[in-house]
C-alpha cells in the first residue's frame, strides 16, 4: 500500500548517522520520516561503549556546534570523562567518554520522540522507489510504500551483512539483528560502485568473574570533570566509574597463533578489508610479532549491568580460543564470557560516487551517510549523518548544498577525503588528517560552525543565545587584553616576579604578557591592572566562563601561528572552490596525460580543489585544467544516462 502521508525526507536506519540525519532535517522544518527495523535499537552503541577520542572528539564537538545530539546524549549517559593529550597543544587535545549504553540510547530516543516534524516507523526497508534518475521514496519489508522528495540511506553494517565466529558464519546486520539482504541487492541493481569491508568486536565479560585487585585502575578526570556539549553541565553526568587495565602476554599470543588455522581472516573465508587503526587481536599478534604485550582496557558497559567491554581484543577466532585467550590474562583467569566476539562483513559503496553534499552522483535526492560510505566509528557516522540530513533538507527546499571546506571543519576533511580519494579500508578520523588542525580545535568548533548552523536552520534559540554570549565575551576580553598596557611603574616588581619570574623593563600589553610561556589567563586576571569583571550574566555560569577563558588564552597565545595558517588558507582558497562543469570532457583538455584524463573522467571531481587531491593528479595537470577553464573551453561531454542534477554554479 502507499502510505497516505508524503514526506520531504526519509531517513533509512536509526544508528548514529540516521538519528543525526533525521534530527537535522526535522530541525530545518522538513517533514521527516525515520525508518528503522527496530525502534528499541535507536541510537544503539553496537560496538564499544565510548564516544570521542583523538580526531573523533573533534567531530563530536562539530556535530554539537551544529545542534546535533551526540555530545548532549553523552553528557547524560557518560560514566567517565577524560581529556586526551591534555599536556600537548590545543590542536590535538580531545574529549573521550565512556557511556552507559542504556542511558545513551534513552537520551537519543527521547530527542527523536520529542522532535517536531519527525515521525518514526518500525519496518525494515527492502527497496527504494526510483523514477528515472531520481529517488522518490522507500518500500518496507511488508510492502508499505512511503513517498518522499529525498532519501538518506544510513544502513551501517546491515547491507548483506555476514557474521563470522571461527569458521561458522551466518547472515546478520549485527549480533541479534537481521541483515538487509534485499536492500543490498536493490542497490547493486542501480549500478552504484560497491565493495566489501569488515569490522569486528570483542567478547563481553561478566564483571563478577573479574579479579579487579590484580588490575590497574584508570579513573576519569575529576578536577575538573569534562563535559562534551558546549551546553553541557557536570550535573548532567550520572555516577562516574573507573576503567581497568590488563595486558596480553606470551601465553595469550601462543593461544592466538594456535587458533589461526580456524580464523576466518587467515583462512580466506573473510574477503573484506578490516580497519587498520582498530585491528583484531589476531592482526596485532601477526603484524607486531616482536611485541611481547598489548594493553587491554576493561570498560564498563553501564551502571546497571556487570558487563565489561575488553577494548583491544576484537576477534573472530572460534569461541573456545576466545575463552582460552581471555583467561590467559591477569585478572581474567576465571572470566565468564557473556557474548562471543565476532567479525562482520558488509557492503559499502565507493564514496567517490558521491558529491561533496553526500548526494549520489547517479541518483538525484539519494544521500548516503555512515559505514555505507566506507567509514568506521560512531563519530564519523554521526558527522556524515548530520551533513546528509542538512543537505537533504536543503535539496527539498530547492537550495544549494552546504559543503564544509577542509579549513572549516574536520567534517570537511572527512567528506573531502572520502569523495576525492575513496577508501581501501574502513576510514577513521585522526587529527593528522587535517592540514589546518591548529584552526580546527575542539574548543572553537562553535566559533567555526554555530553561526553557519543558525543560517541553515539547525541551531535553536537556546544554543544561539549561549553562543552569542560566549562569542561577544571572548571578543570584548581579547580586545581589552590587547589595549590594556602595563609598565614598570604600574606593575610592581613583586607582581611581575610572581607572574614572570622577573620584573618588566618596559611597557607591555596584557596580551603580550599572556603570550609568555607559563603565563595563564587566570594569572593575568590576578594582576591589579589585569583584573577583569565578567558580565554578571556569566558570573554564575562556570562552564561558559571556563570556555571563554580557554578561548581567550588559546587565541592570544597562538595568535601568530593562527594568523600564519589563515594566510595559508587564503592563498590556497584562490582555486579550491572553482567548480568544474559536471560533464566536462577531459579528453579535450590539452596536455593532460592519459592517466589524468582517465582518473578525472572516472571520479568527476566537483571542484579544482577536489581534483588536486585525486591520486595521480599533479600540479601541472591542475594548471592545464585552469587554463582550459579560463579559455572558456569547459565544454560538456554528452550527458551520461542516470546523471543527477546539480544546480551549483560552475566555471565555464
Curated annotation (Swiss-Prot):
Q: Which UniProt keywords apply?
A: Cytoplasm, FAD, Flavoprotein, NAD, tRNA processing
Q: Name one GO molecular function term.
A: flavin adenine dinucleotide binding
Pfam families annotated for this entry? GIDA, GIDA_C_1st, SAM_GIDA_C
Identify one Gene Ontology CC term for this UniProt entry: cytosol
UniProt GO BP: tRNA methylation; tRNA wobble uridine modification
Q: Report the subcellular localization.
A: Cytoplasm
Q: Where does NAD(+) bind?
A: 274-288
Q: Which domain of life is it from?
A: Bacteria
Q: Which cofactor does it need?
A: FAD
What InterPro entries does this protein's entry cite? FAD/NAD-bd_sf, GIDA_C_N, MnmG, MnmG-rel, MnmG-rel_CS, MnmG_C, MnmG_C_subdom, MnmG_C_subdom_sf
Disulfide bond annotation, renumbered to this chain: none
Which residues does the record give as FAD binding sites? 13-18
What job does this protein perform? NAD-binding protein involved in the addition of a carboxymethylaminomethyl (cmnm) group at the wobble position (U34) of certain tRNAs, forming tRNA-cmnm(5)s(2)U34.
How it assembles, according to the record, is: Homodimer. Heterotetramer of two MnmE and two MnmG subunits.
Q: Which family does it belong to?
A: Belongs to the MnmG family.
UniProt-recorded name of the protein: tRNA uridine 5-carboxymethylaminomethyl modification enzyme MnmG
* Species in which this protein is naturally found: Paraburkholderia phymatum (strain DSM 17167 / CIP 108236 / LMG 21445 / STM815) (Burkholderia phymatum)
